[in-house]
Swiss-Prot record:
Annotated protein name in UniProt: Chemotaxis protein LafT
Membrane topology of the entry: Multi-pass membrane protein
Keywords: Cell inner membrane, Cell membrane, Chemotaxis, Flagellar rotation, Hydrogen ion transport, Ion transport, Membrane, Transmembrane, Transmembrane helix, Transport
Record function comment: Required for rotation of the flagellar motor. Probable transmembrane proton channel.
């Protein structure tokens, strides 16, 4: 809703102001200029990015526009899942968790928490590191270093689409100038025409510059920024898992290990310790 409000504000202010000053919307509709700018931008994205980055971009763009949903419930489920796994490991040993770790999509434990189970990247992170913990003794410091490196690698990978889109946004004014230069060439070919005809062609050429600047600063630039912020916000779940597992390896009680992870959750959705404790008690009950 917030993003749609932002888009509406941009459209009303930019085009409303243009019309208020006496401009006509029909003059901005220049399909050839749009084709040049959008085609050049799309082509540069395809040339400059491997397929997996483009695929991730196709997933991130609609998710960013849609906005976050059920974040509070997601983190409550995450803490309950970690509590369930670590309590089981403490009471029955990691050997008991082997079947759950190897096939989380079929695990009765993981399937209890559908919001988290849908996040395949996070589930893979949890199972891989539980497997690592089960293989042998590892100091909290060693585990923390490994987890930090893995989280950094995941974040850098997930930020590639937003960075690529940001570079494309920066190039849009240039693509707009490209379209405008093409329009000027057409204008010069009609230089012996009437003043009205020349004015029409010049106006059409300037639309390219207008659309390039508009697309950059009112479109792709804020979208790429929102995508980057979404990735960094989603990485909180990984930080939560990291802090929990490190605290567990440091021999902290399970509840305190879960609380170590809770402290990494964003303030606007972070439950209090009492809320977390009550939720975990209800899940165990």
């Amino acid at each position: 809703m917030q993003k749609f409000l932002g888009v509406l504000t941009i459209l009303v202010c930019v085009f409303g102001g243009y019309m208020w000053a006496g401009g006509k919307l029909g003059a901005i509709w220049q399909p050839a200029e749009f084709l040049i700018i959008i085609g050049a931008a799309a082509g540069s994205l395809i040339i400059g990015n491997p397929p997996h980055v483009l695929k991730e971009m196709r997933q991130q763009v609609p998710a960013t526009i849609k906005g976050p949903t059920e974040e509070y419930e997601y983190y409550m489920e995450l803490m309950a899942l970690l509590n369930n796994l670590l309590e089981t490991a403490r009471s029955r040993g990691f050997k008991f968790l082997d079947s759950h770790i190897e096939a989380p999509e079929q695990s009765s434990i993981f399937l209890m928490y559908p919001l988290v189970s849908e996040d395949h990247r996070l589930i893979s992170f949890i199972t891989d590191n539980l497997r690592l913990m089960a293989m042998g003794q590892m100091s909290p410091h060693e585990l923390e270093g490994l987890l930090e490196q893995e989280i950094e690698a995941i974040q850098n990978e997930l930020l590639l689409p937003s960075r690529s889109l940001q570079r494309t946004a920066e190039a849009l004014p240039g693509f707009g100038i490209l379209a405008a230069v093409g329009g000027i060439i057409i204008t010069m070919q009609a230089i012996d025409g009437s003043i009205a005809l020349i004015g029409y062609h010049v106006a059409a050429a300037l639309v390219g510059t207008f659309i390039g600047i508009f697309g950059c600063y009112c479109g792709l630039d804020p979208l790429s920024n929102a995508m980057a912020q979404r990735v960094k916000r989603n990485m909180t779940a990984f930080e939560c898992v990291r802090a929990t597992l490190v605290a567990y390896v440091a021999k902290k009680p399970t509840l305190l290990a879960i609380d170590a992870g809770r402290k990494h959750i964003q303030l606007d959705i972070k439950p209090t310790f009492n809320q977390m404790e009550k939720w975990l008690a209800e899940q165990e009950g």
